[in-house]
UniProtKB/Swiss-Prot annotation:
MF terms in GO: electron transfer activity; heme binding; iron ion binding
Membrane-crossing residue ranges in chain numbering: 17-36, 299-319
Protein name as annotated: Cytochrome f
Similarity section: Belongs to the cytochrome f family.
Signal peptide per UniProt: 1-16
Binding residue positions for heme: Y45, C66, C69, H70
InterPro entries: Cyt-f_TM, Cyt_f, Cyt_f_lg_dom, Cyt_f_lg_dom_sf, Rudment_hybrid_motif
One GO BP annotation of this record: photosynthesis
Compartments (UniProt record): Cellular thylakoid membrane
Gene (name only): petA
PANTHER family: CYTOCHROME F, PTHR33288
Note on cofactor: Binds 1 heme group covalently.
Length: 333
């Protein structure tokens, strides 16, 4: 019997290892094929956060991890109801505004449009509404947007993207609220909602390498002796900037196609000086909101209380007028 349990445990461990390896291979393959072999438009890929931070996209400090790759800060907005009833579908609208005329560099260095992506962190128990609970009107508003849970056990954390920014500056999430009557882990009260939205490509890959959508800096102090343009076997163009220090060998900084060089041969530079402009026009923003899971019975009692107060006020007014009439009659008598 013990051997059977041991075998089952080993089988589960083996499956977990295989799954992890497959995810890693898929991630690495996608990275190289999408950005090198098949350059795409400037995109925002929220699933990088899934692969790099599988537990949660929010750090203990409150920062959403997308900011680790998208270094520029931009505005993100969210609209959620102030309160919702249990087991109801409502809209959470994430707005990712940017200048639609803006273009940035793609992986091949060409100017392309921006894509957008978003992560919506709902309270425990909240999740994307199943299709049979979404009204036809809401389906039209959502369009072809595909919603993906951050992980199998976190249906309340949802990611979307990449989507074409020209069409999706507003992303509508159809959210189903939980019902405390059927789930004892859920309680009525006020909850926090965390939202992150990014437009365009990041400046740093999850591996720590810079993308070509970033500023490149001098790695040594000295004089630029040569700037050469080179193309590798895969057709990727890059610039080689030779820096001659006062002593020692020449230092060669590689700049990919995309950012524009702002230095020239014969120019003196210091370590950290910018060799290129900043081509990035996108960025990431996050915002928090609050939502109340309202008890319908409390709402009914509140309505009854307000009605009672209003009735009492009406009765007082009528009584006051009655007293005034009696007083007037006594004075006339």
């Amino acid at each position: 019997m013990r051997n059977v349990f041991r075998t089952a445990r080993l089988t589960r461990s083996a499956r977990a290892i295989v799954k992890t390896l497959l995810i890693a291979i898929a991630t690495v393959t996608f990275y190289f094929t999408s950005d090198l072999a098949l350059p795409q438009s400037a995109a925002a890929y929220p699933f990088w956060a899934q692969q790099t931070y599988p537990e949660t996209p929010r750090e203990p400090t409150g920062r959403i991890v997308c900011a680790n790759c998208h270094l520029a800060a931009k505005v993100t907005e969210v609209e959620v109801p102030q309160s919702v009833l249990p087991d109801t579908v409502f809209k959470a609208i994430v707005k990712i505004p940017y200048d639609l005329s803006a273009q940035q560099v793609g992986a091949d260095g060409s100017k392309v449009g921006l894509n957008v992506g978003a992560v919506l962190m709902l309270p425990e128990g909240f999740k994307i509404a199943p299709e049979d609970r979404i009204s036809e009107e809401l389906k039209e508003e959502i369009g072809d947007t595909a919603f993906q849970p951050y992980s199998e056990d976190k249906e309340n954390v949802v990611i979307v993207g990449p989507l074409p920014g020209e069409q999706y500056q507003e992303i509508i999430f159809p959210v189903l609220s939980p019902n405390p009557a059927t789930d004892k882990n859920i309680h009525f009260g006020k909850y926090s909602v965390h939202v992150g939205g990014n437009r365009g490509r990041g400046q740093v890959y999850p591996t720590g390498e810079k993308s070509n959508n970033s500023v490149y800096n001098a790695s040594a102090t000295g004089t630029i002796t040569k700037i050469a343009k080179e193309e590798d076997a895969d057709g990727n163009v890059k610039y080689l900037v030779n820096i001659q220090p006062e002593s020692g060998d020449v230092v060669v900084d590689t700049v990919p196609l995309g950012p524009d060089l702002i230095v020239s041969e014969g120019q003196a530079v210091k370590t950290g000086d910018a060799l290129t402009n900043n081509p990035n026009v996108g960025g990431f923003g996050q915002i928090d909101a609050e939502i109340v899971l309202q008890d319908s019975s409390r709402v009914k009692w509140m309505i009854a209380f307000v009605a009672l107060v209003m009735l009492a006020q009406v009765m007082l007014v009528l009584k006051k007028k009655q007293v005034e009439k009696v007083q007037a009659a006594e004075m006339n008598f």
